[in-house]
UniProtKB/Swiss-Prot annotation:
Name this polypeptide is given: Putative tyrosine-protein kinase EpsB
GO biological process: polysaccharide biosynthetic process
Chief location category: membrane
Signal sequence range: none
Protein purpose: Probably involved in polymerization and/or export of exopolysaccharide EPS I which functions as a virulence factor. May be involved in an ATP-dependent process in the pathway for EPS I production, possibly export of the trimeric repeat units across the inner membrane or their polymerization.
MF GO annotations: ATP binding; protein tyrosine kinase activity
Species this chain originates from: Ralstonia solanacearum
């Protein structure tokens, strides 16, 4: 039985620390993956840059003026009364509104899509470089076009149920075409230039094709979207923004693959935007004209009355010259009274459009209150003048105030008539949309390098993901830190052993033992260090039976077993090496021996020990092969005969070394390890994971077996140039395909 040694406590994993060296290791180890992904993404970017349909941008620029007329009048600035005082955000929303966009949709029939049917990905690119009509189809099939084919559809109306569904229009030749859709009762035929109307069970189809340039067999794609959906799509595509904060300049642009149509859409939007502004101002002016028309006769009558009273006074009292104080008072009084009357007139006009709670009306009320206070003050000052001068000032003031109001009102009405006639607006088109000549995207000189950068980023991400999911341990220190087990030896990868492994798979007889071929190989030197470590470890072991196992196949366990046995034997020990992997064992190939007879024959009692043991395969080393692969290896290992054999071997040799199957593949190892004095776990650089090692230890502990140490095999210093790297993975249950009926695997190398 294995001595139950206390398990060293697992050292807690370090915190997530920035280890630049290990990160560089991951990048170097996955350099070809990164390069491959970067190249693939760059090729995709280049393909997009050269094959994607060019996108053009058409733009307009409009100016929103605060006040198109600087003339002063009765109402302050009459045009400002009818200007829609809105900020840039409000104007942007008006420009994007369905009221404006809808006109462009209707005038240009944007809800109708009619285009040639191109072959996916490359068809449009080839067509854009063609100079003549093409022969339709791909190998005569499909109706794809490759040339300068075109279609002009002036009208296309379908039942609501068919809106958004694709139709196919096939050219028949001689000016005829056929319209197809799966929802139609039957294909519909029509003539170019003539209206088509066809009644179907789902509704009436109306189509007007004005022009069709293509050879017979060419196919075009037609689609009729709803007007609302088309407007919403156009609204989403519009890019509108103010050019500079509070500049009053608004820019709008639209992207599209058809440069002429894109420019036409923007010009339609600009025209309608300016027109709606003028129309709204004209409507406001009409309401104000009605108000002023009613006010003008009243002002004229008041002016005539004031003049009559003034003339009567002059006739009665004669001419009277005002003093300097009276003249100054008269001028000031006229100014204040005129301002008050203008404010009252302005308030009355605003009330025709707004309520008394409107901010504009309330602001006027505050000004009227202030101005009324000034008038009252002027009235009190007037009483300080002589009586005759008071009467003269009062009458002259009334005449001048009424005259200024009347003249100003006439000027206002003239301006309003201009506004009503649509000749004045506070919005003007600064720049109309020109047909763009150069596409804005894809930017070929930008897309490809950016795709390369993106590819590198994705490659780096893939490298770290791959390392996290599938990367194995690259630093033996990780094993010690995360499992508490000691790493007895780190065996470097041997190029010579790689060659020997290739020869081993040829099944040619010979000895392929690295310890005999190249005894000074670094891998063998590492195994000599392991031999020294074992000498000290065996002092605490319960017996001289050592079991070597691994978590999974392919870790180099057989290589370590064979060469370690040879190294110990050359040190003067009597060693027996047993290949107990009765499912895939192939240690006999290292020594140029046959598989049978072997351990199976001993357990079955068919052969004696002398008949099975291969003596002196290496001086001081005897060897027992597996024998033929049985169907029930686990049951055979549980045979009491196995206990007797192990006791016999332990008494005859200084050390008995047993090579067993992988722990996570089969249960055989736990049976043998339970009787061993020492169990060593062989792991492999970049293949074994911490999760697999932990699971191996766990399964052996369930069988009352403690793993004493670890051999870290096949370290490749050329893989990681900056350090060992790191792997913090979880054990993954996978199907190893490790069965007794499988063929022996290829030889493992250090």
């Amino acid at each position: 039985m294995t001595q139950n040694l206390p398990q060293p406590p697992a050292v807690n994993a370090p915190e997530n620390e920035l280890d630049l060296v290990r990160y560089l290791d991951v990048l170097v180890a996955n350099r070809w993956l990164i390069a491959g992904i970067a190249a693939a993404v760059m090729l995709l970017g280049a393909a997009y840059a050269f094959l994607a349909r060019p996108v053009y941008e058409a733009d307009i620029m409009v100016q929103v003026e605060d006040n198109p007329n600087s003339a002063k009048s009765l109402l302050g600035d009459v045009s400002s009364l009818f200007d829609v005082k809105t900020d840039a955000n409000a104007e942007i929303e008006i420009l994007r509104s369905r009221m404006v966009v809808g006109k462009a949709v209707d005038n240009l029939h944007l809800y109708i899509t009619a285009k040639p049917r191109y072959f996916p990905l490359i068809g449009a690119w080839i067509s854009s470089r063609a100079t003549r009509l093409s022969e339709p189809g791909l190998f005569g099939l499909g109706g794809y076009v490759w040339g300068t084919e075109s279609i002009d559809v002036d009208g296309f109306d379908v039942p609501e149920a068919l809106e958004g569904q694709p139709f196919k229009l096939i050219v028949l030749g001689n000016g005829r075409y056929r319209l197809e859709n799966k929802s139609l009762d039957a294909p519909i035929e029509g003539v170019v230039g003539e209206p088509l109307e066809a009644k179907q069970s789902i509704g009436t189809i109306q189509l007007q094709v004005n022009n069709l340039t293509a050879k017979a067999g060419a196919t075009f794609e037609l689609e009729r979207d709803s007007r609302l959906k088309t407007m919403e799509m156009l609204q989403d595509k519009l890019k509108i923004a103010e050019k500079g904060k509070q500049s009053g300049i608004i820019g709008a642009s639209l992207d599209g693959t058809n440069p002429a149509l894109t420019a036409a859409i923007m010009n339609q939007i600009a025209t309608e935007y300016v027109a709606q502004n003028i129309k709204r101002k004209a409507e406001e002016a009409e309401r104000s004209l009605v108000f002023l028309d009613g006010l003008l006769p009243q002002l004229k009558l008041e002016l005539e009355r004031a003049e009559m009273k003034y003339n009567e006074m002059r006739n009665l009292r004669g001419t009277f010259d005002l003093s300097e104080e009276g003249k100054a008072f008269l001028q000031e009084s006229v100014t204040v009274e005129t301002s008050l009357q203008e404010l009252k007139q302005k308030r009355a006009e605003l009330l025709t459009r707004f309520t008394s709670s409107h901010p504009g009306v309330q602001a006027i009320d505050q000004q009227i209150s202030v101005m009324s206070g000034k008038v009252n003050s002027m009235t009190r000052r007037l009483k300080s003048l002589p009586n005759i001068e008071q009467d003269t000032v009062r009458l002259m003031r009334d005449v001048q105030v009424d005259n200024e109001l009347y003249v100003s009102l006439l000027n206002d009405m003239q301006q309003l008539k201009l506004v009503k006639a649509g000749k004045v607006g506070n919005v003007r088109l600064v720049d109309g949309a020109a047909v763009p000549e150069e596409p804005v995207k894809p930017k070929k000189l930008t897309v490809t390098p950016l795709a390369g950068v993106l590819g590198v980023v994705l490659g780096v991400m893939a490298a770290f993901v791959r390392n996290a999911l599938f990367g194995g341990i690259t630093d033996p220190q990780d094993i010690e830190e995360h499992t508490g087990l000691s790493v007895y030896a780190t065996v470097p990868l041997s190029d010579t052993q790689v060659d020997l492994s290739g020869q081993l798979t040829t099944r040619k007889r010979g000895q392929y033992l690295l310890a005999r071929r190249v005894p000074d190989d670094p891998s063998i030197e590492a195994l000599r260090s392991l031999r020294t470590a074992l000498q000290f470890a065996m002092q605490d072991a319960g017996n001289n039976l050592v079991v070597l196992t691994g978590p999974t196949p392919g870790v180099g366990k057989s290589f370590v077993s064979a060469n370690l046995a040879a190294v110990i034997a050359t040190g003067g020990k009597r060693v027996l090496l047993i290949d107990a992997d009765m499912r895939k064992g192939y240690l006999h190939q290292y020594f140029g021996k046959d598989r049978k007879p072997g351990l199976l024959d001993l357990l079955a009692g068919n052969r004696s020990i002398e008949q099975v043991v291969h003596r002196e395969v290496v001086p001081g080393l005897d060897f027992i092969a597996t024998g033929l692969f049985p169907h029930n290896p686990s049951e055979l290992l549980l045979n009491p005969r196995m206990v007797e054999l192990m006791d016999t071997f332990r008494s005859q040799y200084d050390l008995v070394l047993v090579d067993t199957p992988p722990v996570l593949a089969v249960a055989d190892t736990a049976i043998l390890a339970a009787r061993a004095g020492l169990v060593l776990l062989v792991t492999r650089f970049e293949r074994s994971t911490l999760g697999e090692i932990r699971e191996t230890i766990k399964q052996l502990q369930h069988a009352n077996v403690d793993v004493r140490g670890v051999v870290f095999n096949a370290l490749d210093p050329n893989t990681y140039r900056y350090g060992y790297g790191s792997r913090y993975g979880r054990y993954r249950y996978v199907q190893y395909g490790y069965t007794s009926n499988s063929k022996p695997p290829e030889a493992e190398s250090a």
